[in-house]
């Protein structure tokens, strides 16, 4: 019995030394971070939150816009990564009166969307860089016919097929300049997944108020990414009137290019409305009357009017918000989904007492 107790003590000591050595060797060789991170509670504004991705936020923004304007929504497009989920999501909302059409190609998609706008619905289409390139001719048609149209570019890596599953903010110049002739149109970009809601809503409002196509820039990071999102109160969203031209019951000729003095937008005349027959199409029209006109002076005037109409949108934008120092040595300009990275970098540099500021170009919410 005495020897048995001694052996047990020796075995206990041996096993304890083995455990000590094993633990020491593991700790000495394992690549374990020694820094401790404490995630503080987020400072969130009061309200009801849900988790949302950019795709759903975009679709909800479109739906809110047509509800507030009493319009119908017609989405026509062609599947392309990473924009396809917008079509998939909207196709499940027939109960809200949403019409979706999967076209045979990108050109047919935007053509159907523009045709829907011509018929009195709000036409929307979506694609990515290669598809937007194919839609260029119809974008020009939307500019010259002055019809409302929302085009969503969910950017990906390019050029050509490029990197379909990777994110890249490389389509800005394509969005601003990618049409033949003088064909300006508003281009706005979402900053976060939740911001896609407000950006989509604002794109619809601009398109209807100013009778113009509007390009909304998103990207794969935004539509697939998620964030906590405070559910907005629809009653606080501004209504906007579609402004359809009413019947012309007089003997006077309808003037399709007679414009709103404030916005320079022409009237939205629905086909089949009595007394509103007029010419429409891709050939230049005469100011006010809408007759076909090849005169150089008239063409210059129409080009300038269309450009000024888009420029007038800036009059309703609030002052630019500056994050950081009001005056400093460096100003960082950012747009789109770089918002989070640029803001975090600015905060870090400000803590090092560097005098710099950040302006993120985005649509105000």
Go through each PLM region and give its residues:
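Short, mixed-charge aromatic SLiMs
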Residues: 6-10, 14-15, 82-88, 225-230
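Active-site/ligand-binding-proximal alpha/beta "capping" segment
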Residues: 183-205
């Amino acid at each position: 019995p005495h020897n048995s107790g001694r052996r047990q003590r020796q075995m206990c000591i041996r096993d304890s030394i083995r455990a000590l050595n094993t633990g020491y060797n593991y700790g000495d060789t394992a690549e374990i971070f020694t820094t401790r991170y404490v995630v503080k509670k987020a400072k969130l504004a009061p309200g009801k939150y849900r988790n949302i991705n950019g795709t759903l936020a975009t679709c909800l923004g479109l739906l809110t816009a047509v509800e507030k304007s009493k319009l119908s929504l017609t989405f026509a497009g062609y599947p392309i990564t990473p924009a396809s989920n917008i079509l998939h999501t909207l196709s499940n909302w027939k109960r809200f009166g949403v019409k979706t059409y999967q076209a045979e190609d990108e050109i047919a998609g935007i053509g159907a969307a523009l045709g829907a706008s011509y018929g009195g619905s709000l036409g929307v289409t979506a694609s990515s860089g290669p598809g937007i390139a194919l839609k260029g001719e119809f974008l020009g048609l939307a500019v010259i016919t002055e019809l409302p149209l929302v085009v969503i570019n969910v950017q990906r890596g390019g050029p050509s097929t490029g990197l379909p599953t990777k994110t890249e903010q490389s389509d800005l110049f394509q969005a601003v300049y990618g049409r033949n002739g003088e064909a300006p149109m508003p281009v706005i970009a979402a900053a976060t997944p939740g911001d896609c809601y407000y950006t989509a809503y604002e794109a619809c409002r601009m398109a209807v108020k100013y009778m113009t196509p509007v390009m909304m820039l998103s990207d794969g990071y935004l539509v697939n990414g998620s964030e906590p999102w405070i559910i907005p109160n629809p009653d606080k969203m501004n209504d906007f009137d579609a402004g359809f031209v009413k019947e012309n019951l007089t003997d006077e000729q309808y003037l399709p290019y007679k414009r709103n003095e404030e916005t320079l937008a022409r009237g939205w005349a629905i086909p089949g409305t009595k007394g509103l027959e007029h010419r429409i199409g891709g050939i230049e029209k005469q100011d006010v009357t809408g007759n076909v006109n090849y005169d150089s002076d008239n063409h210059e005037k129409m080009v300038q009017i269309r450009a000024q109409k888009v420029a007038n949108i800036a009059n309703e934008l609030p002052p630019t918000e500056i994050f950081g120092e009001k005056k400093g040595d460096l100003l960082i300009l950012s747009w789109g989904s770089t918002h989070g990275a640029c803001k975090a970098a600015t905060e870090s540099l400000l803590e090092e007492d560097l005098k710099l500021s950040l302006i993120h170009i985005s649509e105000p919410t």
